């Protein structure tokens, strides 16, 4: 088993944090993303770790070489990182991909070691790691059946939020057997890139393969293990909370936010002062029913609002200020 890490991107949405370094060099809790990932992978007795690098690659390679991990690291340099996407980076690693079973992951992830163990301990050869869809997630989503078959790939722009209970999110960590890579994935990857170009995503190739044969890959579902994808400074801020060094530090970071805890779906807040009777169910139903109109139309002026308030509270308009 080997690992391939895609780390060529520029991470523009992180602004100044990636001005002189690639995205995987940003820190969460004082530890760089790539450092955390490599130390986890180094424990798994892998034959090698292949990194496809591009933007600010000299800084990245120098840093990785200085970590002193035991697993050999091979580098592939994507010189055209600024005008290609991850399908091109992965195609550059195809000769490694067909050699042996592979853990494929993207470098902008922060995750628990348990995620890697889930894939390694599962006897199934080709797996996509997935998590139940939550409101903070974006990007490609999946529909998974009771046998863990991936029955649909849904691009982020086509998500129907009314159907979100059916969705799973790709974590962007995969286990690919050498046989699957050699006989299925790489041939499709090459053909897809020839037709569609190199500014595409490798997930599109997986979607195409599964449209033809849903048995080539299964979904491996997470069960509460922590992970986060770092695309912008808000992601980074949330990851600082999720991956705080200990419970005390996590508590400090959470309480300093003074709300907005819906961004942490599994958090139970026992301190926030709320009125449990408001809003009543009837009011919520009416708001939902009129939501489209409320969003699209502009409100009445002050005179009409004073009139409505006077009617609601049973007082004269002159007493509304």
Language model features with spans:
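Short loop-beta-helix segment that forms the pyridoxal 5′-phosphate
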Residues: 299, 309-321
């Amino acid at each position: 088993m080997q690992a391939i890490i895609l780390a060529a991107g520029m991470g523009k949405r992180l602004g100044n944090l990636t001005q002189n370094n690639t995205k995987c060099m940003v820190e969460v809790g004082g530890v760089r993303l790539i450092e955390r990932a490599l130390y986890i992978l180094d424990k798994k007795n892998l034959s090698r770790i292949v990194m496809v690098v591009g933007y600010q690659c000299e800084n990245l390679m120098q840093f990785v070489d200085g970590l002193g991990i035991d697993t050999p690291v091979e580098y592939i340099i994507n010189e055209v990182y600024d005008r290609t996407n991850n399908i091109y980076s992965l195609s550059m690693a195809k000769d490694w991909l067909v050699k042996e079973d592979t853990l494929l992951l993207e470098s902008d992830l922060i995750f628990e070691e348990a995620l890697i163990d889930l894939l390694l301990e599962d006897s199934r050869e080709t797996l996509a790691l997935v998590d139940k869809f939550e409101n903070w997630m974006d990007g490609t989503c999946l529909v998974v059946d009771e046998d863990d078959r991936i029955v649909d790939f849904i691009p982020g722009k086509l998500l129907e939020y009314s159907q979100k209970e059916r969705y799973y999110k790709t974590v962007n960590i995969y286990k690919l057997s050498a046989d699957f890579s050699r006989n299925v994935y790489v041939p499709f990857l090459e053909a897809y890139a020839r037709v569609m170009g190199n500014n595409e995503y490798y997930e599109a190739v997986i979607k195409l393969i599964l449209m033809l044969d849903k048995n080539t890959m299964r979904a491996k579902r997470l069960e509460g293990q922590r992970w986060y994808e770092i695309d912008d400074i808000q992601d980074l801020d949330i990851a600082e909370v999720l991956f705080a060094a200990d419970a005390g530090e996590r508590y400090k970071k959470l309480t300093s936010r003074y709300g907005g805890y819906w961004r942490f779906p599994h958090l139970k807040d026992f301190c926030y002062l709320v009125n449990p009777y408001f809003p009543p169910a009837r009011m919520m139903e009416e708001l939902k029913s009129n939501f489209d109109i409320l969003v699209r139309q502009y409100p009445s002026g002050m005179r009409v609002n004073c009139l409505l308030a006077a009617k609601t509270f049973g007082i004269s308009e002159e007493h509304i200020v």
